[in-house]
A protein has these predicted regions:
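Positively charged n-region of N-terminal signal peptides that target proteins for export
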Residues: 1-4
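Short N-terminal segments immediately surrounding and downstream of signal-peptide cleavage
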Residues: 24-46
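Short, contiguous alpha-helical
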Residues: 38, 42-49, 61-105, 146-189
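Well-ordered alpha-helical scaffold segments within catalytic/enzyme domains
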Residues: 47, 51-52, 90, 127, ...
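Surface-exposed helix-capping loop/turn segments at secondary-structure junctions
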Residues: 53-62, 132-141, 178-184
Length: 189
């Protein structure tokens, strides 16, 4: 019985210490919704952009071909698509039209070189950061028009698209890189 009580007392003291630490950390690190959402964009940007930079320009037209891959986007098309969605979602959050050509989620046909594609991508992340910076506790859950379908959504819901959509395509791009003998930068030691 004494051992059981000692274990419970130790456990209680440990939990109390951990919860106090967590509370003081939470108070010191309290962030706004906008800051949290911006952190998500920074995370995907920090992996996506280096992956886009890692592929040599002569491989930007690469798409898997062994198996049933008809209609799969090339490496360059993956990047332009993510950038276009960043602009589309950012514009919806801001309540405006995209400031650049998004070409039905494909990105502009005129953007072809690696340098131009990377510029389009990086500027789309700047626009995404600008969009989430306008999100406040007051407008976070306010119903707004969404660019995908006819229903209403929220700025919070749309802001999550930057991360999950970017990482969805990052996963595909990581495979493309590896199929070309390139270790994605985020996987390097």
């Amino acid at each position: 019985m004494k051992k059981t009580i000692a274990v419970f007392v130790s456990l209680f003291v440990s939990l109390l210490a951990m919860s106090s630490f967590g509370v003081s950390q939470a108070v010191a690190e309290k962030k706004t919704a906008s800051q949290v959402l911006d952190g998500g964009i920074k995370t995907v940007e920090g992996e996506f952009v280096p992956a886009a930079e890692a592929m040599p320009e002569d491989k930007y037209d690469f798409a898997p071909s062994n198996g049933d891959f008809k209609g799969v986007r090339t490496f360059a098309q993956q990047i332009k698509h993510v950038a276009a969605i960043n602009y589309i979602v950012g514009a919806a959050i801001l309540g405006e039209k995209p400031p650049v050509d998004v070409n039905e989620e494909k990105g502009p046909d005129s953007v072809k070189s690696k340098a131009d594609i990377l510029k389009y991508l990086k500027e789309s992340f700047v626009y995404a950061h600008k969009a989430v910076a306008t999100i406040t506790e007051a407008n976070l859950l306010e119903p707004i028009a969404v660019p995908f379908g006819k229903e209403k959504g929220t700025r919070l819901g749309l802001a999550t698209v930057f991360a999950w959509h970017g990482f969805d395509h990052y996963g595909q791009m990581a495979v493309y890189l590896r199929m070309n003998g390139i270790v994605p930068p985020a996987s390097r030691n």
